[in-house]
Amino acid sequence: MAPNLRKSHPLLKMINNSLIDLPTPSNISAWWNFGSLLGICLMTQILTGLLLAMHYTADTTLAFSSVAHTCRNVQYGWLIRNLHANGASFFFICIYLHIGRGFYYGSYLYKETWNTGIILLLTLMATAFVGYVLPWGQMSFWGATVITNLFSAIPYIGQTLVEWAWGGFSVDNPTLTRFFALHFLLPFAIAGLTLIHLTFLHESGSNNPLGIVSNCDKIPFHPYFTLKDILGFTLMVLPLTSLALFSPNLLGDPENFTPANPLVTPPHIKPEWYFLFAYAILRSIPNKLGGVLALAASVLVLFLSPFLHKAKQRTMTFRPLSQLLFWILVTNLFILTWVGSQPVEHPFIIIGQLASITYFTILLILFPIIGTLENKMLNF
């Protein structure tokens, strides 16, 4: 009998083991769709980004005009740009839901997969930040100035580090050029990290909503989950195209329609919506270094999740107290996001400070305590 090429060819064999014959738990829900959606997002962003880069000029005098030219004069340039800008928002929606799923169902106990995932998140955040600077509008310029300036809070080497990042003594042409280079490079680094992420995942196999070993009940990835992923893809593309076609500037800042001007500061400098929770935590501490440390901790705290898991059960499916705490955490993140978009004045300052304290308290103190308490409740 002739060998099956899909199972014998060195390259096709890898694809087969990852996407076709992969044994998958039969009970994984739609929350497991977001990994494949993130892959689709990445491919879409790389494709639209490549097309945009063909018409973009990384020069302070021409950047803003080149983006306007792309939207006005390039065939479907407006659509490519709108898909790219709003695609970033969908990328973050998917990654936050993906992390939330991992947190709820205890997927962080696959330590290597979880850690590479956090590195992926950090790389994505860096990519989105440098990308936001490229149109060289007011918010691009001042966002770049404010965020890069945070590195000056690092003792001893801070100021040198900032000037090295800027390529001068302020955000100017060298900064824009290197940000464009980084924005072009980093998505490919994300693609490479994704392969590492998947390699670690396929070592153990997927987790499932019950958090128990599912070796006795696994089904092939294709056709069952390929079809399910196509449904998820369709359900994501519909709102993305609707947003890009009907309300492309809904999530953007009006300030970015004004070309960058170092002499005029916008009344309220704020990042895109997907960074607002971290920005609110940064602003909640009146000390510069303290704020920077809190900002870093807001994401890096995820590295501690596997070590703070004290419950005997892996997932929160049958842990009502942890569930309650989880949804309080989600609500708290929405509050932080809202506060980050508001001006620095009463009552937003105190709300931001309370929400920041709550965020770290839930993650570092309450989750382990509640996990231990639920273990005791199992004995009753």
UniProtKB/Swiss-Prot annotation:
The chain crosses the membrane at residues 34-54, 78-99, 114-134, 179-199, 227-247, 289-309, 321-341, 348-368. Its main location: mitochondrion. Keywords: Electron transport, Heme, Iron, Membrane, Metal-binding, Mitochondrion, Mitochondrion inner membrane, Respiratory chain, Transmembrane, Transmembrane helix, Transport, Ubiquinone. It comes from the Eukaryota. Heme b b566 binds at residues 98, 197. Heme b b562 binds at residues 84, 183. A ubiquinone binds at residue 202. It is found in: Mitochondrion inner membrane. It holds the Pfam family Cytochrome_B. InterPro entries: Cyt_b/b6_C, Cyt_b/b6_C_sf, Cyt_b/b6_N, Cytb/b6-like_sf, Cytochrome_b, Cytochrome_b_C_euk/bac, Cytochrome_b_N_euk/bac, Di-haem_cyt_TM. Component of the ubiquinol-cytochrome c reductase complex (complex III or cytochrome b-c1 complex) that is part of the mitochondrial respiratory chain. The b-c1 complex mediates electron transfer from ubiquinol to cytochrome c. Contributes to the generation of a proton gradient across the mitochondrial membrane that is then used for ATP synthesis. Belongs to the cytochrome b family. Heme 1 (or BL or b562) is low-potential and absorbs at about 562 nm, and heme 2 (or BH or b566) is high-potential and absorbs at about 566 nm. The cytochrome bc1 complex contains 11 subunits: 3 respiratory subunits (MT-CYB, CYC1 and UQCRFS1), 2 core proteins (UQCRC1 and UQCRC2) and 6 low-molecular weight proteins (UQCRH/QCR6, UQCRB/QCR7, UQCRQ/QCR8, UQCR10/QCR9, UQCR11/QCR10 and a cleavage product of UQCRFS1). This cytochrome bc1 complex then forms a dimer. This is Cytochrome b. The gene is MT-CYB.
